Regions:
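Nucleotide-activated chemistry modules centered on ATP-dependent adenylation/adenylyltransferase
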Residues: 1-193
Length: 193
């Protein structure tokens, strides 16, 4: 993949804690970061994923990709029940609604906490690569998450541009990644009526 745009990491950091939702969404982002001499440390924090078997499959694919590139992957605890407690009353919200925003805030707040405790100055997320998610909500959640930690900055980056979407498709084929058909939670599995 050629460098199609310049990445400007806040503070010029060369190491970033990358909240990762799945291997397909993270693949081109990780490759792009590495080509720009940025080392991503993959943070797999996805208590929203249902069922747990799905969580494990996605985690294993992230691990396989990280290991193939010699990158560190950190697995946050899977606590789906705690996640459910945080979204009570929002179960019927549509995709891109309030439930998604609350979910993003929860996951990115945990990412920011980990970054603060382990010396990372910058976090970003692969959620910003999905055309199915609101970039505005993701950035709001990232800013919310880092507001409590003066030493951690959220890196707003539109990972849908610069040829990354096309490269993502190629990497999925190259690695034969499992490519799920829903965001992750049981509520995103609902069929459109």
């Amino acid at each position: 993949m050629k460098k199609k745009f310049q990445l400007e990491v806040p503070g010029g950091a060369d190491k970033v804690l990358l909240h990762t939702c799945c291997a397909p969404c993270s693949s081109a982002i990780i490759e792009c970061m590495m080509q720009h001499h940025i080392t991503p440390v993959i943070y797999y924090c996805n208590p929203n994923i249902y069922p747990q078997e799905e969580y494990i499959i996605r985690k294993e694919e992230c691990t396989r990709y990280a290991q193939s590139l010699g990158l560190e992957i950190i697995d946050a605890d899977y606590d789906h029940e705690n996640w459910r407690c945080h979204i009570i009353g929002m179960e019927q919200e549509p995709e891109r609604g309030g439930r998604c925003l609350r979910c993003f805030k929860l996951r990115l707040l945990e990412t920011a906490r980990y970054a603060h405790e382990h010396g990372f100055s910058v976090i970003t997320t692969t959620l910003a690569s999905s055309r199915w998610k609101s970039l505005e909500q993701i950035n709001e959640a990232g800013q919310y998450a880092t507001a409590s930690y003066a030493d951690v900055t959220y890196w707003e980056q539109n990972w849908r541009k610069g040829g990354l979407s096309e490269r993502r498709i190629a990497i999925i084929k190259e690695y034969n990644f499992y490519n799920q058909q829903y965001c992750g939670c049981e509520f995103s599995m609902r069929k459109e009526e």
